[in-house]
Structures are given as C-alpha cells and as structure tokens.
Amino acid sequence: RGENYSANVTYFDVDWDGIIIQVTPGCGWRYNFNGGKAETSGWEVDFTYAINDELSVDFAGSSMTAETSIDITSLGASAGDRLPNTVESQWNLGLVYDTTIFSYPSYARLDVNYYGDSFNTFAENPASSSPDYTKLNFNLGVDLNDNSKLQISIDNLTDERTEAYIYAVDDTSWRPRNWMQWIPPRTVSLKYTFDF
C-alpha cells in the first residue's frame, strides 16, 4: 500500500479429497459425481491506483488450474484433466472519473469484464461449453444530497452479441439437444437511492 495505490496478491494451492463435481451428459440432465481427488491452484490479484485527484484505475482478476488427480474411467477422465465447469481466468479493469455535474458531486465509471471459458465435461467439447467473452459496462452516479443518489447504468455498453452457453450434443433422445444462450443485450437502468 502506498500514498496513491494499494495492491493485494493471493496464491492458493488446495488438494481436494472427496470432491463433488457436476456433470452434464448428452441427455441434458445434470448430476453430481464423486470426483475423488483433485488439485486447484492459482492467483488472485487486485489493485487500485489514483492517477490524480479525479482519475483512478482498478483491477481485479484471478487465474487458476483445477485438475483431477486420479483417473475416472466412467467419465473418460485421466489424471491431470481439467475439471468440468471451472473457469481458469477472469478479470475486471475499471476506470473512474470523479467530477461535478451542476455542482453535484458525481462520478463516471467504465469497466471491462473478461470471463474465461468452461466446459461441461472432461472432454472439453466446445459444443457443450460456456465460451470466453469480454464486455463493457458504464455507470454514471450523482450525489443529489447527503441522503439521495441517482445512478444510470449501461450493461454491455457496445451491445456485444456473443455466446454465453452452448449445448449442441449428439444424443439418442427424441428431443433435439441443440441450443444456445446469448449474453444479455445492452441494458440501461436508472436507480434512485434514498437513505433515512
């Protein structure tokens, strides 16, 4: 920690025994499976830095590996394979500008969010996964007085159209297993807060 910055770094290394993992087979129904032993390790980092009295930047992110420590024949997994439904990296970078609007204390914040990919099974099949994606968010806040605040938020500022979840697998079921879920489109919200 310094005069205009702060930083935190955490390393973790966990040996799991009797871990429960969630599996999504071709039928579409999820179930929990006794995964036996697994290892997870990685880093978590966050920092803030005040560039000047009005402008500051902050970052928070993590990077990890999560692997089975044993062979799981029934699921086609070998020791060292990535665990299903685990995200190996994600981060957020934010830029904040403090100012005044019509003499009211205000701020504007722009965030870049990155979400890493994950897979439903040990096979890491892209047709049954959550792909990685990046999106922008924007917030503008105004302190009207000591008790009330007004905030406008724009989620997915650039209206990015990308897949959040893909499920397209071969199966003997009579019902097609071929669909996709998108991340939410640009969404604008207005929030008024009053403290009493």
Predicted feature locations:
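Activation segment
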Residues: I20, L55, E67, R161-T162
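Feature captures outer-membrane beta-barrel proteins of Gram-negative bacteria and organelles
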Residues: Q90-Y97, L136-L140, L190
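C-terminal beta-signal and adjacent terminal beta-strands/loops
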Residues: N113-T121, V142-F196
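Strand-connecting loop/turn motifs
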Residues: G2-N4, N52-E54, E88-Q90, I101-P105, ...
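Short, glycine/charged-rich beta-strand-loop motifs at protein surfaces that mediate ligand recognition
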Residues: T10, A123-S130, L136-G141, S148
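A generic structural micro-feature
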Residues: K37, S130-D132, W182-P184
